[in-house]
Amino acid sequence: MALKTDIRGMIWRYPDYFIVGREQCREFARAVKCDHPAFFSEEAAADLGYDALVAPLTFVTILAKYVQLDFFRHVDVGMETMQIVQVDQRFVFHKPVLAGDKLWARMDIHSVDERFGADIVVTRNLCTNDDGELVMEAYTTLMGQQGDGSARLKWDKESGQVIRTA
């Protein structure tokens, strides 16, 4: 099935910036079980040459989620977001993310293919700091399938996840 909107080559700029919070860094580190002292202590971060807490490597997924939600709120691709799953992701880090950083995000639709009745979309996601320096780039592969209902999914409020029901 083809996507309703031709998104190939589209560039989506998130309309706002994201400020990395000191306590967000700590909370995220605890949540993903990262125990390096530079995530919790300014002194430990300073020992590594940084002037603020360092965020765990996957911290930028918080901003990435905002960008994807904003994209799907504004671009009608012709399917519900519950029918879209992330099948791959690769990160390329250029600079550490520090507490207090002001980050900007852009999502480029790198490729769109149709295989076996599913749409495969690869995005290149760029995260820059307030000086315009590239902090991180990620390549994300999403798969969406419009429905014959063969993959029955629903939102489970208790677990906070999308689950397969059949």
Swiss-Prot record:
GO terms for molecular function: (3R)-hydroxyacyl-[acyl-carrier-protein] dehydratase activity. CDD domains: R_hydratase_like. InterPro entries: FAS1-like_DH_region, HadA-like, HotDog_dom_sf, UPF0336/Enoyl-CoA_hydratase. One of its GO terms (cellular component) is plasma membrane. One of its GO terms (biological process) is fatty acid elongation. It holds the Pfam family FAS1_DH_region. HAMAP family: UPF0336 (MF_00799). Belongs to the UPF0336 family. This is UPF0336 protein Rv0637. The lineage of its organism: Bacteria, Bacillati, Actinomycetota, Actinomycetes, Mycobacteriales.
